[in-house]
């Protein structure tokens, strides 16, 4: 299933990120460069798993004939805008706050789509079981994904706290990827 694929991809990337983080701290402890956040690795993981989570919404609705391909592409596109703008802001390739705002606007669009837009309208025409699954995933995308902008803030500004950022991102990933 898509949920198992999301969990498997996350497990693989977290195994790799753990090694990166451990090696970075060992280098710092030995007098080398300061340990940094595995930002690129984290965004690679998200660029795979987040669109898969969005696809799961579509597949649940498509399985009962209640979704259009256009709905999938709108959700997929919004998820990419959200992630790419977040990466550009966090990596310093773009201005931090405007990139956060663009990413949040894309996330808000996804939230709108699943609570009031075509995705919601499609879900309303399905069975009670499908409605239940859809609502559970909608809550995860709304509440669970709200953790990420908080983490983003921890890594920005003149005194970023990368340890707190990574702890918060790890908690968010565990909550969101296992609950999904």
Stretches found by the model and what they are:
Residues 1, 61-70, 92, 120-132:
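Membrane-interface helix-boundary motifs at transmembrane edges
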Residues 1-7, 45-56, 73-82, 103-106:
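Mid-membrane cores of alpha-helical transmembrane segments in multi-pass membrane proteins
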Residues 1-16, 144-154:
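Hydrophobic alpha-helical transmembrane segments of multi-pass membrane proteins
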Residues 8-41, 84-93:
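Helix-loop junctions on the outward
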Residues 14-15, 43-76, 87, 91:
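Internal transmembrane alpha-helix with an interfacial aromatic "cap," most often the third helix
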Residues 56-59, 84-85, 106-128, 136, ...:
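Alpha-helical transmembrane segments in multipass membrane proteins, preferentially the mid-helix core
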Residues 69-111:
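Hydrophobic, aromatic-enriched interface-forming segments
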Residues 150-175:
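Extracellular/periplasmic helix-loop-helix junctions in multi-pass membrane proteins
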């Amino acid at each position: 299933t898509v949920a198992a694929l999301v969990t498997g991809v996350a497990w693989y990337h977290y195994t790799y990120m753990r090694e990166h983080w451990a090696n970075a701290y060992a280098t710092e402890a030995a007098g080398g460069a300061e340990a940094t956040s595995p930002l690129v690795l984290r965004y690679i993981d998200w660029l795979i798993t987040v669109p898969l989570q969005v696809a799961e919404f579509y597949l649940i609705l498509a399985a009962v004939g209640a979704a259009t391909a256009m709905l999938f592409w709108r959700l997929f596109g919004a998820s990419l805008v959200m992630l790419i703008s977040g990466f550009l802001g966090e990596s310093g390739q773009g201005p931090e706050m405007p990139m956060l705002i663009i990413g949040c606007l894309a996330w808000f669009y996804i939230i709108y789509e699943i609570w009031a837009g075509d995705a919601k309208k499609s879900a309303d025409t399905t069975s009670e079981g499908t409605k239940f699954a859809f609502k559970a995933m909608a809550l995860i995308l709304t509440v669970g994904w709200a953790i990420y902008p908080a983490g983003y803030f921890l890594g920005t500004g003149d005194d970023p706290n990368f340890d707190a950022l990574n702890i918060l991102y790890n908690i968010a990933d565990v909550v969101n990827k296992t609950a999904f």
